[in-house]
């Protein structure tokens, strides 16, 4: 158990922040570079625990990766279908994205045997949503609960293309199937009820794969051949969300968040905060390596309640913990619904946020698929727990900026999973 993090109310927040590189894009950049022919250069890669887990797995499979903690990461790929059999178990750490996407990468490598595991949290998370469609393609995957929980064992096979209809909008499911489809003969497609984030489709196309998108259906034609690329990873809007909320609720604040990815499949947090009355300007829009990027300027503003649900959820699911903090400071009753997926993240984020914000005095009701938050009640500093969940830890730190007294967050270091510089940036922008 690490040392607790203490936070007291901020008088104001000001300054410019270059938020950490996008976690979702960082994973995909490493994986596709490892599967490509030649040497790729990736700038702005997130230097967090999760991408390190991905890099370690790819090294064990034969890719050469250097400079993982520096500004430019170099990856010499092995080419599709040429991964090496690892000598040991592949440890995914805490990264669900690594495990689910690597299942798709490994399933179509004929004759390759791998065992995948992770930490206690990851071993409890559901994997059948990915394993089932891969099995439909001919994958041989075994594990606890009939392949529903790690550790998982994979024996690579020649896969067949399928048309998969996903019951949920999940970028991880979609990406795993599309990655497996790179080595299957023909067109592999995934249809979703609502379009999930599309980083995989954009990046696969950049690396030379034939990708087709029609509404909520994405498809890839195999067998494919990937070519090395030079990439820049934009700032993570999920990390920017902490500052968007903090800058909104701390009085007299103004923050500029530079170089943030504003992919429309990820900008639900901007829509939700706009509905709550936040003062956020999207400036200097541009495109970087196929991804839309902008600078975000946030100024403090009185917030009002809104309803968050439906088609918004896939576009802001990772930001719901910090949006719950915003709701505590908004006038009226905010309803968050259709978010049962949060129960199977690094923690049960609905239960966790209800419990921990309740400790700070929030009027919050947990529901099976969401939260109901009666805003406008003053938060009071107290001891709270991160539950070893990076987004919970950082959300509680944002709450501590407006809670009276001192808020003590137990096990705060889990923030390094997605935003290693978070506490450093917090110290820099707060004005005592």
UniProtKB/Swiss-Prot annotation:
MF terms in GO: 3-phosphoshikimate 1-carboxyvinyltransferase activity
EC nos: 2.5.1.19
Family statement drawn from the similarity comment of this UniProt entry: Belongs to the EPSP synthase family.
Main enzyme class: transferase
GO cellular component: cytoplasm
Annotated organism of origin: Gloeobacter violaceus (strain ATCC 29082 / PCC 7421)
Catalytic residue positions: 318
Function, in words: Catalyzes the transfer of the enolpyruvyl moiety of phosphoenolpyruvate (PEP) to the 5-hydroxyl of shikimate-3-phosphate (S3P) to produce enolpyruvyl shikimate-3-phosphate and inorganic phosphate.
Protein name: 3-phosphoshikimate 1-carboxyvinyltransferase
PROSITE patterns cross-referenced by the UniProt entry: EPSP_SYNTHASE_1, EPSP_SYNTHASE_2
Key words of the record: Amino-acid biosynthesis, Aromatic amino acid biosynthesis, Cytoplasm, Transferase
Chain positions recorded as 3-phosphoshikimate binding sites: 23-24, 28, 170, 172, 318, 345
NCBIfam families tied to this protein: aroA
Complex formation: Monomer.
UniProt-listed SUPFAM superfamilies: EPT/RTPC-like (SSF55205)
UniProt entry tagged with the keyword GTP-binding: no
Localization annotation: Cytoplasm
GO biological process terms held by the UniProt record: amino acid biosynthetic process; aromatic amino acid family biosynthetic process; chorismate biosynthetic process
InterPro entries: Enolpyruvate_Tfrase_dom, Enolpyruvate_Tfrase_sf, EPSP_synthase, EPSP_synthase_CS, RNA3'P_cycl/enolpyr_Trfase_a/b
The reaction(s) this protein catalyses: 3-phosphoshikimate + phosphoenolpyruvate = 5-O-(1-carboxyvinyl)-3-phosphoshikimate + phosphate
Pfam family, one: EPSP_synthase
Binding site for phosphoenolpyruvate: 23, 96, 125, 172, 349, 391
Source organism, top-level taxon: Bacteria
Pathway noted in the entry: Metabolic intermediate biosynthesis; chorismate biosynthesis; chorismate from D-erythrose 4-phosphate and phosphoenolpyruvate: step 6/7
């Amino acid at each position: 158990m690490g040392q607790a993090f203490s936070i007291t109310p901020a008088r104001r927040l000001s300054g410019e922040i270059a938020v950490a590189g996008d976690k979702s894009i960082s994973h995909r950049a490493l994986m596709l570079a490892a599967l490509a022919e030649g040497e790729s250069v990736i700038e702005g890669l997130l230097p967090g625990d999760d991408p390190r887990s991905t890099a370690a797995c790819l090294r064990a499979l034969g890719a050469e990766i250097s400079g993982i903690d520096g500004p430019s990461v170099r990856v010499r790929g092995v080419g599709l279908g040429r991964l090496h059999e690892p000598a040991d178990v592949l440890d995914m750490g805490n990264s669900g994205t690594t495990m689910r996407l690597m299942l798709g990468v490994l399933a179509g490598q004929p004759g390759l045997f791998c065992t995948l595991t992770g930490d206690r949290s990851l071993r409890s998370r559901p994997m059948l949503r990915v394993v089932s469609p891969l099995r439909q393609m001919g994958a041989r995957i075994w594990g606890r609960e009939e392949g529903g929980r790690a550790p998982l064992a994979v024996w690579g096979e020649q896969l067949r293309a399928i048309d998969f209809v996903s019951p949920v909008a999940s970028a991880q499911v979609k990406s795993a199937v599309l990655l497996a489809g790179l080595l299957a003969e023909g067109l592999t497609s995934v249809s979703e009820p609502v379009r999930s984030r599309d980083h995989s489709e954009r990046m696969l196309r950049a690396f030379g794969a034939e990708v087709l998108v029609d509404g909520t259906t994405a498809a890839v034609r195999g067998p494919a051949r990937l070519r090395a690329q030079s990439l820049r990873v934009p700032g993570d809007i999920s990390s920017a969300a902490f500052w968007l909320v903090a800058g909104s609720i701390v009085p007299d604040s103004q923050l500029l968040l530079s170089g943030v990815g504003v992919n429309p499949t990820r900008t639900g947090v901007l829509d939700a905060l706009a509905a709550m009355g936040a003062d956020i300007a999207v400036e200097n829009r541009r495109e970087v390596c196929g991804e839309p990027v902008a600078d975000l300027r946030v100024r403090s503003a009185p917030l009002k309640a809104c309803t968050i649900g439906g088609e918004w959820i896939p576009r802001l699911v990772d930001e719901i913990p910090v949006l719950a903090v915003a709701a505590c400071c908004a006038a009226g009753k905010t309803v968050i619904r259709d978010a049962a997926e949060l129960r199977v993240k690094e923690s049960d984020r609905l239960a966790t946020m209800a419990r921990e914000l309740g400790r700070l005095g929030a009027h919050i009701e947990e529901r099976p698929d969401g939260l109901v938050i009666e805003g406008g009640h003053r938060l009071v500093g107290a001891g709270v727990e991160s539950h070893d969940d990076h987004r919970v830890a950082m959300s509680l730190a944002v709450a501590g900026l407006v809670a009276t007294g001192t808020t003590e967050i137990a096990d705060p270091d889990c923030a390094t999973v997605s935003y290693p510089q978070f506490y450093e940036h917090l110290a820099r922008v707060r004005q005592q």
